[in-house]
UniProtKB/Swiss-Prot annotation:
Gene name per UniProt: trpF
Example of a GO biological process term: L-tryptophan biosynthetic process
Native source organism of the sequence: Alcanivorax borkumensis (strain ATCC 700651 / DSM 11573 / NCIMB 13689 / SK2)
Membrane spanning stretches: none
Entries under NCBIfam families matching the protein: PRK01222.1-4
Protein name listed in UniProt: N-(5'-phosphoribosyl)anthranilate isomerase
Protein family: Belongs to the TrpF family.
Domain of life of the organism encoding this protein: Bacteria
Keyword Isomerase in annotation: yes
Amino acid sequence: MTVPRVKICGITRIEDGLAAANAGADAIGLVFYGPSPRAVTARQAAEICASLPPFVTTVALFVDASRAEIEGVLARVPVDLLQFHGNENPQFCDSFNRPWIKAVRMKDDVDLHHYAQIYRNAAGLLIDSYVAGVPGGTGETFNWGRVPKTLPLPVVLAGGLHPGNVAAAVTQVQPWAVDVSGGVEQKNVQGGRSGGIKDASAIRVFINSVKTRGVAGV
C-alpha cells in the first residue's frame, strides 16, 4: 500500500502550522470562509506560510467565494493548491491557473464516478461527510464502503477522522491522502473541540498512525 499523504486543515496559528510540519504533515489547510471557526485572514495566512519549512504544501480552502476574493488571497498568500468546498463549477475551478481539488459531500445519492467525470481536471476529489448546512469540518464520519476502488482521480479522505480511527480508514479506503481538522484539535472546558487550536500530540499520533499503516499495508 502506498503511504497516504496527510493534510492538517484549519490551521489558524503559526505554532500549529509548525507542529504539523514537524510531525511530518505533507500539507496544511487554510480556511478562507468567514462562518468557519477556523477562518483566517490573508494576513494571518501569509504569516503562517512564511513560517513553514520547504516542501510543505499550502492549501487554500474556499466555499463559493467570489473571483475577487480568491484572487485577493492569491495576491497575498503563497498558495500551492486550491480546495473548492462549495458548489463551484469546473470551469470556475479551472480558471485560476493553480492545481485544485474539489470536495464532495457524501449525500445519499452522490455518484463519485459522475463527480470524477465532471471535475476531471481536478488534482483529486476530497470526499467528506454530509451534514445539512455545514460545508465542512463536521466531525462526522460516513460509510467508507461507499468510496469506489476504481475512481480515476486521487481520493482525499476526510470527514470525522481522528487518531483513533484513521488507521482503519486508511486500511479500508486506501486513499491517496487523508485530511483532518477537528480530530486533532484541543478540547475546550465543555469537552468539545476548540475550533482551530490544534493539539500537537494528537497531530503526531494521527500522522504516525497513517504512515505506519500505509507502510504495513495491513
